């Protein structure tokens, strides 16, 4: 029996490792276009920043490691160009242009997503970069060093865009962030919470332009400037952080059913073709709160999906649960997290909500080092928590994790307000900020 996994990101490698964990005999082959594998794309901005010393430090395993430790074959710099699902066969081409075919018993599409680059004049000039692979990160640093770059425009104010903006500022560049939406982190935070992040960026010397599309990139061979809102801004390079699109071309060739957003899968991560599975950024999933199809382009979802697919291929029953798209980011000294619905998304879906708020310190007031934290908690009209956003100096991630569990368990405002939390002056307040936000919502619910 042979399982072939196309893609060496978190989803693909987790699938391969999970199959091997539960099946010691199956032949497992991972095929990837990339030269290097098992690295963390989420860490790229932090290498740019200098918080991580080198791109080599974010590579966790080599193909040789996988062969030696797990008996998994990795074919690097190899592209799958066709899938014949009727005959369980794929066609590949290696880095030298040689074509070859392989048969499979199980096929896993872990083809990820591709950066979306808007059709802007000048997008193909030298000095325009995307941020997706370790090679992208290396190319950015090399270009800065070889060209003595002083100014950069970052297009897109999502998490990657802002993390890159801060990282490039730490490298000594003047940074301009350009965002079409009227706020930073438009898919992550409500406008009032996003304003905290924007003010922090501006305090750090990063210029932020909102509700302004990038009109064109100017230069002869290299980037020289950008046009934004009819004005010319001199820059030496442009970072395009304008989102990604699921890579579903091989799924189409295989004849897999494509849903509204990406490859359609069941809870076992099977596609419409039973022996073909799909995992990671190329699949659509179910939103826990609305029950609607959505995308979940996060490493945590990719790993969970890989475990589910791997178990099922190995004969161990497993299922993937609906998502909340819990996420966290760190930009300088600011931590930003969110899970579930925002007030904006709830209003779009016409879900009646009540909002609870709290602003507090992360440690006892008298204990040195406490950081301010601000919480916005979203409840439905039945008083069940359906979303939470937190911005602050520390300990955001663990609170978002706690709220993710609370949403899944359909915890009420009353339960959250009265929940038992731990306390010690160096690490927490006696009044847990999550409970304070729930208390605020509870008062409003009681008055309805």
From Swiss-Prot:
One of its GO terms (molecular function) is NADH dehydrogenase (ubiquinone) activity. NAD(+) binds at residues 152-167, 179, 243, 328. It holds the Pfam family Pyr_redox_2. It comes from the Archaea. FAD binds at residues 7-11, 42, 80, 110-113, 132, 271-281, 299-300, 423. Gene3D superfamilies: FAD/NAD(P)-binding domain. Its EC number is 1.6.3.4. Keywords: FAD, Flavoprotein, NAD, Oxidation, Oxidoreductase, Redox-active center. This is NADH oxidase. The lineage of its organism: Archaea, Methanobacteriati, Methanobacteriota, Methanomada group, Methanococci.
């Amino acid at each position: 029996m042979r399982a072939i996994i196309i893609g060496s990101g978190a989803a693909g490698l987790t699938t391969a490792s999970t199959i091997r964990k539960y099946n010691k005999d199956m032949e497992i082959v991972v095929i990837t276009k990339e030269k290097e594998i098992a690295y963390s794309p989420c860490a790229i901005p932090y290498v740019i920043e200098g918080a991580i010393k080198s791109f080599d430090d974010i590579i966790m395993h080599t193909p040789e490691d996988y062969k030696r430790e797990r008996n998994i074959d990795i074919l690097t710099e190899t592209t799958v160009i066709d899938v014949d699902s009727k005959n369980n066969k794929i066609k590949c081409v290696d880095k030298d242009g040689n074509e070859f075919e392989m048969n499979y018993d199980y096929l896993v599409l872990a083809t990820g997503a591709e950066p979306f680059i808007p059709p802007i004049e000048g997008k193909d000039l030298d000095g325009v970069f995307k941020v997706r692979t370790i090679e992208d990160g290396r190319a950015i640093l090399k270009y800065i060093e070889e060209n003595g770059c002083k100014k950069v425009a970052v297009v897109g104010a999502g998490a990657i865009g802002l993390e890159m903006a801060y990282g490039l500022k730490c490298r000594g560049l003047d940074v301009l962030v350009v965002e079409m939406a009227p706020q930073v982190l438009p898919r992550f935070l409500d406008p009032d919470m996003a304003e905290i992040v924007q003010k922090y960026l501006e305090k750090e010397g990063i210029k932020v332009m909102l509700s302004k599309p990038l009109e064109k990139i100017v230069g002869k061979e290299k980037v020289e400037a950008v046009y934004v809102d009819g004005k010319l801004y001199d820059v030496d390079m442009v970072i395009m952080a304008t989102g990604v699109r699921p890579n579903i071309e091989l799924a189409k060739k295989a004849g897999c059913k494509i849903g509204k957003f990406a490859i359609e899968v069941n809870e076992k991560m099977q596609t419409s073709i039973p022996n073909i599975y799909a995992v990671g950024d190329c699949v659509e999933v179910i939103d826990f709160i609305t029950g609607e199809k959505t995308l979940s382009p996060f490493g945590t979802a990719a790993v969970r999906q890989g475990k589910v697919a791997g178990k099922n291929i190995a004969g161990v029953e497993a299922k993937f649960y609906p998502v909340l798209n819990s996420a966290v980011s760190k930009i300088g000294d600011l931590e930003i997290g969110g899970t579930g619905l925002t007030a904006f998304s709830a209003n779009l879906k016409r879900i009646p909500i009540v909002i609870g708020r709290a602003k507090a310190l992360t440690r006892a007031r008298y204990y040195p080092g406490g950081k301010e934290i601000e919480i916005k908690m979203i409840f439905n009209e039945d008083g069940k928590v359906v979303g939470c956003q937190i911005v602050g100096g520390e300990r955001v991630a663990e609170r978002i994790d706690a709220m993710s569990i609370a949403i899944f368990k359909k915890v009420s405002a009353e339960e959250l307000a009265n929940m038992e939390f731990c306390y010690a002056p160096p690490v927490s307040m006696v009044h847990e900020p999550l409970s304070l936000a729930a208390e605020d919502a509870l008062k409003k619910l009681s008055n309805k």
